[in-house]
Amino acid sequence: MKTVLTLIVAATLSLFSVAFAADTVVPQTTPTATAPAPAVHNASAKTMHHKKAQKPNTIKNTHKTAPEQKAQAAQKHHKAAHSHKAPTVAPAAK
């Protein structure tokens, strides 16, 4: 039983040492043999900045005429002025 356990431990340690050796050994290749990776994949997510798609100026700069603006503003102010009613006081009962 001890020999089986010893063989398993030895096999496990040898596999770990082989994997470690494979990670630490860098194969010597010429730099022209491999294509450089695109810069997009090398940059971290923090440095990436995506710009928003901009709308064309014709959509962005649609101006209302003055009477339409005044009418809309009057409606808003009318609603705001009448939405805050003063509390009504009930007469005290004697």
Swiss-Prot record:
Protein name listed in UniProt: Acid shock protein 1
GO CC, alphabetical: periplasmic space
Segments of this protein annotated with the region Disordered: 30-94
Coiled-coil zones: none
Record's subcellular location: Periplasm
Native source organism of the sequence: Yersinia pestis
Comp. bias regions, Low complexity: 30-40
Functional note: Required for growth and/or survival at acidic conditions.
Stretch forming the signal peptide: 1-21
Keywords, in A-Z order: Periplasm, Signal
Family per similarity comment: Belongs to the Asr family.
Composition bias, Basic residues: 75-85
